């Protein structure tokens, strides 16, 4: 597990300007960055290693006024705003904790703790040696020197993904967020 500070200033400004969910936008950008790093697309089936075309996000979502979250899973697609709209629609329409049919693909698990400034997070569970599902979590963003940052935790199976790959993910995520400074 690796945790690092992620500057999200441009993302927060972008989501505010475009009336988008910061959370859904962060899920989308992390998913896009992960899918750009081939090592994150490795999966193990029946003892054999494969590279999948993409991983889809599967993320916790807490409906307004509720203390019972649900798991939302859907393809990220190619458009940030479209993903945010689709995620919101799916969350409103989904009445069960988890849609088992949507969980059948190659996934990335996401969680967010917006109530605390995250310094590290380890997901519970007994992950087997062939578990290749990346787990991404982040906490509340805080302001320092006019910039918003948050602690972002990346939990992976070290048999398949190394620090080099986490660095590649972080660089791609940074680039995607910085690119929003010049958009909408």
Question: What do the predicted segments below correspond to?
Answer:
Residues 19, 23, 80, 162-166, ...:
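Short, charged, low-complexity patches
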Residues 130-182:
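Active-site-proximal acidic secondary-structure segment that organizes catalysis
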Residues 30, 84-91, 169-177:
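Short amphipathic C-terminal alpha-helix that caps PH/PH-like domains
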Residues 1-13, 54-78, 149-155:
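Acyl/amide activation-and-transfer machinery of modular secondary-metabolite enzymes
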Residues 1, 63-118:
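Helical lid/core segments from catalytic subdomains that handle acyl or acyl-like groups
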Residues 1-3, 98, 105-145, 149:
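Flexible, Gly/Pro-enriched loop and linker segments at secondary-structure and domain junctions
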Residues 4, 14, 18, 33:
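Aromatic-residue-lined binding/catalytic grooves and analogous aromatic/hydrophobic interfacial grooves
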Residues 20-57:
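Hydrophobic "lid/gating" helix adjacent to the active-site nucleophile
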């Amino acid at each position: 597990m690796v945790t690092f500070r992620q500057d999200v200033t441009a993302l927060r400004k972008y989501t505010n300007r475009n009336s988008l969910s910061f959370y859904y936008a962060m899920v989308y950008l992390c998913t896009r960055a992960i899918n750009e790093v081939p090592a994150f697309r490795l999966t193990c089936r029946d003892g054999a290693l494969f590279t999948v075309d993409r991983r889809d996000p599967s993320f916790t979502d807490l409906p307004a006024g509720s203390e019972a979250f649900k798991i939302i899973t859907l393809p990220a697609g190619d458009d940030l705003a479209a993903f945010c709209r689709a995620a919101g629609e799916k969350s409103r329409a989904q009445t069960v904790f988890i849609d088992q049919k949507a969980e059948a693909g190659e996934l990335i698990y996401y969680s967010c703790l917006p109530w605390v400034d995250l310094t590290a997070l380890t997901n519970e569970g007994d992950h087997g040696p062939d578990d290749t599902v990346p787990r991404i979590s982040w906490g509340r963003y805080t302001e320092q020197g006019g910039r918003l940052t948050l602690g972002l935790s990346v939990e992976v199976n070290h048999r398949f993904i190394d620090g080099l790959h986490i660095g590649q993910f972080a660089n791609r995520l940074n680039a995607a967020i910085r690119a929003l400074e010049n958009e909408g």
